[in-house]
Amino acid sequence: MSNARPQAGEKLRDDEKVKHIPITIMPTEKAEMLRKPEWIKIRLPRTTDRIDHIKKTLRKNNLHSVCEEASCPNLAECFNHGTATFMILGDICTRRCPFCDVAHGKPLPPSAEEPVKLAKTIAEMQLKYVVITSVDRDDLRDGGAQHFVDCINAIREHSPTTKIEVLVPDFRGRMDKALEILKNGVPDVFNHNLETIPRLYRECRPGANYQWSLDLLKKFKEQHPDIPTKSGLMMGMGENKEEIAEVLKDLRAHNVEMLTLGQYLQPSKHHFPLKRYVHPTEFDELGVIAKEIGFTHAACGPMVRSSYHADKQAAGVEVK
């Protein structure tokens, strides 16, 4: 592929996606790949009927799930459980985070039909708890905030009893505008992931800012004190336990109540290299620390993801 700018709708993946970020990602050779330990287990269902049904429903309505786009290891379990995390605003991200498997490029304009299609799909599937996330849309003046509101309000209209969790981008350069817009469609849980420790931001989250993300969570909470705020991090990218504990303190200092900690799994040899597999006991220890410093919910375990059993997380059920 040439160095020409991608056309609208063109997806860049793997080496094409990460070759222009501030650091050089050298492909991880097969011999260098860390062997998965026995505790990294993907739970496969006995039948794929429900999984196939959800995929067909998404295709029929031209909808996307982050489960598929980000190659989540829990896809089979969650789809078979009848849950999905819907990804709005398309499937092309304006950022190039090297840990993430979502494609980069120039996104298409938001679909005006998506909010109603999404709401009708959720009603058809009779979902009681949904998570709505999005790609980063730095090309939009509001970062996509109005589209989030349109989706939330459409879901409320078609499924009044469905609980809605949003996992939002950082609204870089547009925080105040986005938060003002979000007042017109308030979710039941507000989630924004820090993803990693501040020392690794330049490598892992080019274009993002650690303090900005903390401030986004804090400002939302100040405006909506009754709505739980939530954040999550991946482990195994070069951080240590003490650095994670410091981030947990920062989150609590910014009034974040819910936490997820999970194992980073390298999507391909072109992505950010996995440095270690974190033992389940370390996740347990961090979960104890989280509760001790005031988190009301802490889902900590190798296979935990931000929206993994999000309904159970919100209900206070232990998730690992």
UniProtKB/Swiss-Prot annotation:
CDD domains recorded: Radical_SAM
Places the protein is found: Cytoplasm
Reactions listed under catalytic activity: [[Fe-S] cluster scaffold protein carrying a second [4Fe-4S](2+) cluster] + N(6)-octanoyl-L-lysyl-[protein] + 2 oxidized [2Fe-2S]-[ferredoxin] + 2 S-adenosyl-L-methionine + 4 H(+) = [[Fe-S] cluster scaffold protein] + N(6)-[(R)-dihydrolipoyl]-L-lysyl-[protein] + 4 Fe(3+) + 2 hydrogen sulfide + 2 5'-deoxyadenosine + 2 L-methionine + 2 reduced [2Fe-2S]-[ferredoxin]
Alphabetic keyword roster: 4Fe-4S, Cytoplasm, Iron, Iron-sulfur, Metal-binding, S-adenosyl-L-methionine, Transferase
GO cellular component annotations of the record: cytoplasm
Cofactor: how and how many bound: Binds 2 [4Fe-4S] clusters per subunit. One cluster is coordinated with 3 cysteines and an exchangeable S-adenosyl-L-methionine.
Residue ranges of every copy of the Radical SAM core domain listed in the record: 79-296
Binding-site list for [4Fe-4S] cluster 1: 67, 72, 78, 307
Coarse class of the protein's main subcellular location: cytoplasm
Cofactor: [4Fe-4S] cluster
Entry's EC annotation: 2.8.1.8
Xref: SMART domains: Elp3 (SM00729)
Positions with a binding annotation for [4Fe-4S] cluster 2: 93, 97, 100
EC category: transferase
Family to which this protein belongs: Belongs to the radical SAM superfamily. Lipoyl synthase family.
PANTHER family: LIPOYL SYNTHASE, LIPOYL SYNTHASE, MITOCHONDRIAL
Protein name stated in the entry: Lipoyl synthase
